[in-house]
Amino acid sequence: MAYRRRKKKIKKCRLCEMKLDYVDYKDTRLLSEFLTDKGKIIPKRLTGNCSKHQRMVKVAIKRARQMGLLPYLKI
């Protein structure tokens, strides 16, 4: 039996659509959308972010963790 491939839904970068030039580490509500329930950073192939904004999100999350605004682990 032949299986048909499903077309992948093309995800667009939400941060590009919002026209953000800078991802602020103090915006924990936005940053928490890019974390799993255990506190790990979601990869860009799942979020649909472009490379530029994924790097900004990564750096902002790491800064927020260091400042104590976001937890390293969620238990």
Curated annotation (Swiss-Prot):
Pfam family, one: Ribosomal_S18
Keyword RNA-binding applies: yes
Coiled-coil regions listed in the entry: none
Biological processes annotated in GO: translation
NCBIfam families attached to this UniProt entry: S18
Function description: Binds as a heterodimer with protein bS6 to the central domain of the 16S rRNA, where it helps stabilize the platform of the 30S subunit.
Protein family: Belongs to the bacterial ribosomal protein bS18 family.
UniProt protein name: Small ribosomal subunit protein bS18
